[in-house]
Amino acid sequence: MISVKKHFGDTSGKYLYLSGWMIAAMRSEFGPLPDQSMHEKTSVPALIEELYTFLRQADARELGDLFTKLDNANDNDRSRIQKEIENFKTHVVPIIADIDAGFGNAEATYLLAKRMIEAGACCIQIENQVSDEKQCGHQDGKVTVPHADFLAKINAIRYAFLELGVEEGIIVARTDSLGAGLTKQLAVSNEPGDLGDQYLSLIHI
């Protein structure tokens, strides 16, 4: 973000995306791993905290330089430097965090999402694979959870945002159904009009 700000003048419209693939490859205590949710679940919130600490330090360093210049400025430069301080553009940008498949059931998803939000994530991405069977995005043989289970995890993330007072938190819900078999792709319908029936009505055979 320091380089981005130097090049563009500010970081408006920019963000950081912490993908599960990147975390698994670079932040696991077990060393580089494939994108199969084998890294420690706390790796993402820990990295969010680390990044925000670094970005705030970048702000502090740049502002510190400006205040030093202000202290040593003559009358001609003081107004210009004061305006730079007042119009300072932060290095801090939104962070999108990949929670993979939630690392467990809906409650586990809620607890981890809450930790990510507390660390500073404003957006959480979740996918509908079974956590214990997670495959890399380019691989076949994926196993997806039932639709109701996925919705429970999405709601768990929503509840985490609301509990922490973040009313405009963003959830990116991604499906891997195309790479999964029909056993998990089709929703179970118990009666007309239920959630499963609504999903099945969208399928054209």
Question: Which residues are covered by each model-predicted region?
Answer:
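Active-site beta-loop-alpha junctions enriched in small/polar residues
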Residues: 1, 21-23, 100-104, 129-131, ...
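N-terminal glycine-rich anion-binding loops that anchor highly charged ligand groups
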Residues: 2-28
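Generic structural signal for hydrophobic
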Residues: 4-8, 51, 116, 157
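Short, well-ordered coil/turn segments that N-cap beta-strands
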Residues: 12-14, 90-93, 121-122, 165-169
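Hydrophobic faces of well-ordered beta-strands that scaffold small-molecule active sites
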Residues: 14-18, 95-99, 124-126, 171-175
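Active-site beta->alpha loop and helix N-cap motifs at the rims of alpha/beta catalytic domains
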Residues: 34-151, 182-187
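Phosphate/pyrophosphate-binding betaalpha-module
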Residues: 123, 146-169, 186-195, 199
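Conserved small/polar residues in nucleotide/adenosyl-binding loops
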Residues: 203-205
